């Protein structure tokens, strides 16, 4: 779902980000039914918040996401919403993860983020698709 420009009551904007994050200890656990459920949860979260996801790739040990959202929230707030919501549900639905992950989080603390301009967008989309 791509949007060229979004409009607010007094704003017009187009802000896209390439975000990457990993499970705790970079464990290779994001596959099969867990990866499918994770994708569903991310899509739901993005839809509920009225953001737009242009591309996603879930690898065994990391996630790539190309996302557009309103600039009224910070990048760190957006990442916290995605990671926090998915962590809780995935840990509840896949209790066998306790064997690999200690503590109360599925995700490592940090993340990578870069802004994506119009010129770079197709390059980033192809990169994510080819992961």
Range-by-range predicted roles:
Residues 1-131:
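Basic nucleic-acid-binding interfaces
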């Amino acid at each position: 779902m791509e949007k060229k420009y979004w409009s607010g009551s007094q704003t017009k904007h187009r802000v896209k980000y390439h975000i990457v994050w990993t499970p705790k200890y970079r464990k290779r656990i994001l596959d099969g039914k867990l990866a499918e459920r994770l994708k569903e949860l991310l899509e739901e979260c993005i839809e509920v918040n009225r953001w737009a996801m242009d591309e996603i790739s879930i690898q065994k040990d990391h996630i790539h996401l190309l996302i557009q959202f309103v600039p009224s929230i910070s990048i760190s707030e957006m990442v916290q919403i995605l990671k926090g919501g998915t962590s809780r549900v995935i840990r509840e639905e896949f209790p066998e993860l306790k064997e690999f992950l200690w503590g109360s989080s599925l995700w490592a603390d940090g993340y990578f983020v870069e802004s994506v301009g119009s010129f770079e967008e197709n390059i980033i989309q192809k990169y994510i698709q080819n992961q």
